[in-house]
């Protein structure tokens, strides 16, 4: 039995949910999102609770049960609170600046990296060595944060690079004489 799937998703005040043919649509103060659930599960809206139930006892149906419930929960949280991810730039001369629809990154290359800011996300730079990515879709926020981090992943000797806020970089010892 799924430990995640057996609990309902609570719909907060200010969020409107519609469920039709396993398509869940959520509207909130931050926007609107839609999720199409897998065919092996059934979704129902009762009062202010969204229940997810597997249609059969197959292994795949049980796998989709918890996944669907988690995705619907992220959908509801996204349109009500939103998601954000913070990145830190560590290194001499490493800096970022959001200019219009482009994020300019100086990461020690011979040129600046221009990263186009997607329409559905908001990217801010509270400090020259910090980037904050926020949006409605949890997967999209994490994907863009990962793409920005991949330009210069933290290296293990000095820890220079783009890292997630609070991330611990495994450090190595240098060569011994």
Swiss-Prot record:
Please report which protein family the annotation says this sequence is part of: Belongs to the universal ribosomal protein uL6 family.
A molecular function (GO) held by this record is: rRNA binding
User: Which Pfam family, any one, appears in the UniProt record?
Assistant: Ribosomal_L6
Q: How does it associate, per the subunit comment?
A: Part of the 50S ribosomal subunit.
What task does this protein carry out? This protein binds to the 23S rRNA, and is important in its secondary structure. It is located near the subunit interface in the base of the L7/L12 stalk, and near the tRNA binding site of the peptidyltransferase center.
Q: What is the lineage of its organism?
A: Bacteria, Pseudomonadati, Pseudomonadota, Alphaproteobacteria, Rhodospirillales
What is the official name of this protein in its record?
A: Large ribosomal subunit protein uL6
Q: Which UniProt keywords apply?
A: Ribonucleoprotein, Ribosomal protein, RNA-binding, rRNA-binding
Protein's UniProt keywords contain DNA damage: no
Gene3D superfamilies in the record:
Ribosomal protein L6, alpha-beta domain
- HAMAP family reported in the protein's UniProt record: Ribosomal_uL6_B
Known InterPro entries for this protein?
Ribosomal_uL6-like, Ribosomal_uL6-like_a/b-dom_sf, Ribosomal_uL6_a/b-dom, Ribosomal_uL6_bac-type, Ribosomal_uL6_CS
Q: Name one GO biological process term.
A: cytoplasmic translation
User: In the UniProt record, which is one GO cellular component term?
Assistant: cytosolic large ribosomal subunit
């Amino acid at each position: 039995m799924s430990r995640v799937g057996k609990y309902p998703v609570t719909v907060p005040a200010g969020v409107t949910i519609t469920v039709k043919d396993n398509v869940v649509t959520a509207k909130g103060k931050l926007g609107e999102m839609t999720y199409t659930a897998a065919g092996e599960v059934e979704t129902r809206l009762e009062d202010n609770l969204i229940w997810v139930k597997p249609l059969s006892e197959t292994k795949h149906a049980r796998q989709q049960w918890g996944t669907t419930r988690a995705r619907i929960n992220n959908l509801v949280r996204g349109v009500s609170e939103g998601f954000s991810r913070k990145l830190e730039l560590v290194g001499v001369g490493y800096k970022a600046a959001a200019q219009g629809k482009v994020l300019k990154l100086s990461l020690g290359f011979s040129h600046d990296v221009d990263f186009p800011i997607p329409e559905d996300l908001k990217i801010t730079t509270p400090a020259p060595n910090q980037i904050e990515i926020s949006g409605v879709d949890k997967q999209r926020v994490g994907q863009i944060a990962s793409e920005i981090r991949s330009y210069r992943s933290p290296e293990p000797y000095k820890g220079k690079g783009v890292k997630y806020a609070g991330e611990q970089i495994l450090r190595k010892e240098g060569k011994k004489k």
